[in-house]
Amino acid sequence: MSESIFRKDATAQGVAKQRLIETLAEPEERIINDPYADRFVLGASVIKFMGHRLNVWLAQKLVPGFHEHLISRTRFIDDLVKKNSASGVEQYVILGAGYDSRAHRLELPSSLRIFEVDQPEVQARKRSKLPEELSNLENMTYVAVDFTHQTLTEQLINAGFDQNKSTVFTLEGVSQYITKEALSSTIKEVAALTQRASSTFFISYVSDLFDKNPEACFGKGYPNAEKRAKLIMYGSAKVGEPWISFYSAEEIENVLSQHGYSVKENVTMKDLNSRYFAPVGRALSENQLLQLEHFVMAESQN
């Protein structure tokens, strides 16, 4: 697995910002709740002062549907992790965890062993922002990996990962930043780690149409789709994290199947708009849909 799997602070903070904005919504309207997101966001007090509606309105002016897209991804993974842990899955590995807060904000069973994998400096920064009692949960282990002389496999096993136990792995918002070879290598290593037990793998990826025909990744009538696509990519490159890899559904399915995984679900914001936002009266119209990422859940075939 490549060191480039790990993102810099800007991306992790940007996702945490959207979680904070969503948390400011009325309880009966919000899709996710993250009481810790403000700890990771610069200017959190200003965002709180502005409130949910104004922040979302501003986001819609810049890139319509962007906030909802990231929140739907967060909720999709939340549901996946909760469902698997409730059904008896014993371990949860968060690859490139960044400022992920699921170990703290979701009501997961204490029997679920959680491993957060990231670079040492990222983990140190994250832990310094959390209350001490949350930074030292008994069922949670921080797995720091320095790829100059360590591997994911050895560090996970050294941290207590049990290769005989069922596991959920999540790789959220990362695939577009790393080479296709690095992604394949990561999946291969995960598959080898869990060949004696069942495993579920979540991955998000950016459609190859976003690179070839960006308008196809937006809803009908979306304003200035190509311009917005360039804005998204420019913003990421500006903070030193350019998007370099795009995939078709067939390509993702092939790389997963090569390593023993079968795709069970592949959805976009269009699917999750009706699943999450419509029931609380916040459904986006067709011309607000941003479908640049696909969210995939795959299961091992062993």
Feature locations, PLM:
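A short, conserved alpha-helix within the catalytic core of class I
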Residues: 151-154, 177-196
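Conserved SAM/SAH-binding loop
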Residues: 146-149
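A short SAM/SAH-binding and catalytic strip from SAM-dependent methyltransferases
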Residues: 159-182
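Conserved beta-strand signature within the Rossmann-like core of class I S-adenosyl-L-methionine
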Residues: 168, 192-209
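Rossmann-like AdoMet
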Residues: 1-93, 99-143, 163
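Short acidic/polar active-site loop segments enriched in Thr and Asp
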Residues: 90, 199, 262
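Rossmann-like AdoMet/SAM-dependent catalytic core
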Residues: 8-10, 210-302
